[in-house]
Amino acid sequence: MNALIDNRVLALAGVVQALQQVRQIAETGQSETSAVRTAIDSVLRIDAESPEAVYGGIRNLTQGLQLLHDYFGNQLRDQLLPRLTLAVLQLERRFIRDTSIVAAVSTGITQAAHQVEQTGDSAHPEILSTLGALYANTISHLRPRIIVQGNPHYLGQAGVVAEIRAMLLAALRSAVLWRQLNGNLLDFLLTKRAMAAATERALR
């Protein structure tokens, strides 16, 4: 049981870490390249052998795990982040039921993977633009849409919007993994203590 919860927490950390970048980009127009790369790589690693492998190792999720630790300890400063996380976890349910959108996203991710082979960098602006467009043309049609609040100056810039959408796609990918590991919204009520303990284990 511990192993399942441990893996589920990694997936949830992936969601939160990607969404933290969404919040940061929306407010400042800037992102953390390492976090963006971890998020985009997780989108491209469709057939990874384990949740840890999806993110290239637990260390790459340190930021997300720390955010979860703060949340479980009632010390999270950004009160919009939990709401955004809940919205993405709910979006995952609508996404997975729409087989045509799932197929389109899968095809788009495969094309992006080939593009990464050419650029050699998953965090390259061209890749972010491609994945951002993929999100806009597919997932953004699901209702209700994810609403991102931030600085209008940055939210009016095409490159910023593309990166935000790419990060939302990455968050959704982690949400799908979370659900595949039997994640459920009731976990936050029924297994919150176990999830907090798993978060602490991952941070050691």
Swiss-Prot record:
Q: How does it sit in the membrane?
A: Peripheral membrane protein
Give the location in the cell: Cytoplasm; Cell inner membrane
Q: Translocase among the record's keywords?
A: no
Provide an example Pfam family for this protein. DUF489
Is Nucleotide-binding one of the keywords UniProt gives this record?
no
Highest taxon above the source species? Bacteria
Which InterPro entries does the UniProt record give?
HflD, HflD-like_sf
UniProt keyword terms in alphabetical order: Cell inner membrane, Cell membrane, Cytoplasm, Membrane
The terms describing its cellular component in GO are: cytoplasm; plasma membrane
SUPFAM superfamilies xref list? YcfC-like
Member of which family? Belongs to the HflD family.
Q: Which HAMAP family match?
A: HflD_protein (MF_00695)
Protein name stated in the entry: High frequency lysogenization protein HflD homolog
Q: Which organism is it from?
A: Xylella fastidiosa (strain Temecula1 / ATCC 700964)
